[in-house]
């Protein structure tokens, strides 16, 4: 009808866009993406992480995004199965853009050896107001800075 204002549809999510896709399409929802609000971000420094090292972070810090340079296929398959069967708010991405993700989320990369030893201080986790990843891109909406910190 004339004079009726229509809402503007946003074609891209808000936040910083990076060329990072999902580590496995099984993490995606029916729309082909993961959309997590108030996500915790675990940046893993190194490769070779196993499910044993990931069980505590996954159980304690949901929703959780795992960010690593590489991850074994069996680990990814188990993560996808947990996401689907237990409806866990969980995603994994494989990327070399570790410093960029750490900077945007405030994460401190954690070594596989530290995870193996059970060492994961809460302050090492990054955070995002919203984390959206599809097959090829990620949008990270950082948490607003705390009042009084500059």
Q: Can you describe what each PLM-predicted range is?
A:
Residues 1-150:
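Core, soluble structural subunits of large cytosolic macromolecular machines
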């Amino acid at each position: 009808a004339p004079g009726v204002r229509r809402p503007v549809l946003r074609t891209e999510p808000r936040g910083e866009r990076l060329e990072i896709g999902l580590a496995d399409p099984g993490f995606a929802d029916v729309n082909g993406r993961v959309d997590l609000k108030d996500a915790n971000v675990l940046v893993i420094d190194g490769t070779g992480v196993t499910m044993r090292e990931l069980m505590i972070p996954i159980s304690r810090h949901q929703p959780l995004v795992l960010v690593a340079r590489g991850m074994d296929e069996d680990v990814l398959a188990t993560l996808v199965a947990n996401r689907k069967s237990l409806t866990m708010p969980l995603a994994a991405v494989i990327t070399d853009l570790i410093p960029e993700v750490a900077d945007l989320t405030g994460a401190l990369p954690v070594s596989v050896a530290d995870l193996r030893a059970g060492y994961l201080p809460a302050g090492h986790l990054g955070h995002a107001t919203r984390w959206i990843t599809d097959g090829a891109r990620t949008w990270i909406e950082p948490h607003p800075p705390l009042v009084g910190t500059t």
